[in-house]
Amino acid sequence: MNIAILSGKGGTGKTTVSTNLSTIIGANYIDCDVEEPNGFIFLNPSQIKREEVKVDYPVVDSSRCTLCGDCAKVCQFNALVRTKKEIILFEKLCHGCSACSIACKHSALTFGKRTIGIVEEGKCGNLICKRGVLNVGEPMAVPVIKKLLKNLPQGTNLIDCAPGTSCNVVNSLQYADGAILVTEPSAFGLHDLKMAVQLVRNFNLPFGVIINKYNAENERIQKYCEQEDINILGIIPYRREAAEVYSLGKMIVKLPEYKEIFEEIAKRLREVFPWN
């Protein structure tokens, strides 16, 4: 069972929910927020194994190249530019699709590999923790995410997605059997929750909502969920003591009130999702 945890916007508490819930239900933790992965701060896994993530990029053989420019014309990402003297490659724009090589009539293109990030795997007690880390300055996270999700552990996996509803999240949802949407009771939270709801509905996934940073003065999220017939899996109150524990890199389920809340969320999960 792979459960994706996502949000329409950043800062709603995806990683808070993912890490604490993984310890309560005994699920493996998979951090797909590869541009800013921070789940390991809280789970602190040991026995870390690392593997580089590499992508293809074209290499021009100047002895064969006639500067016809066919490779540049066919590139949909403008990674290749023909000048009077050479073909210039903007390697960070290249998606490694090989269209340029197919278009070249003179076999002047071969492919090399370059490293764009790493995938790490470790242990937190009996749980397996995995994360992808994109190198600073690299624009494309999807190859790292795909590498990370290629061989998921057996059992239940919580997939901590990137914020938003971009292609990074779409690629993560392709491996999911269900989704948890984490939101906050603000105007921006509701706006972006609606986008996330539309996305998971397009994937036809069972899903529910967790309201984080809750205060009783604002019921906009509950009203929206009622109108849309969306399951509310749990409500996590806004408390100073939780923020203090979190700021120290510790799990909020260490607090009795929050442990009880996450145990109730775990029960609701089993009711909403086709658990096996």
Question: Where are the predicted features?
Answer:
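Walker A (P-loop) phosphate-binding motif
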Residues: 1-25
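C-terminal lobe/tail of nucleotide-utilizing enzymes
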Residues: 199-276
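Ferredoxin-like iron-sulfur electron-transfer modules
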Residues: 8, 21-25, 44-67, 78-96, ...
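Iron-sulfur cluster-binding cysteine motifs and their immediate structural context
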Residues: 70-89, 99-115
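Switch II (G3) loop of P-loop NTPases
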Residues: 31-33, 131-136, 145-169
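Inter-motif core of Ras-like GTPase G domains
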Residues: 168-187, 193
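Short, well-ordered beta-strand core segments
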Residues: 4, 27, 157, 179-180
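Short beta-strand-centered segment that lines the nucleotide-binding/catalytic pocket of NTP-utilizing
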Residues: 27-40, 113-118
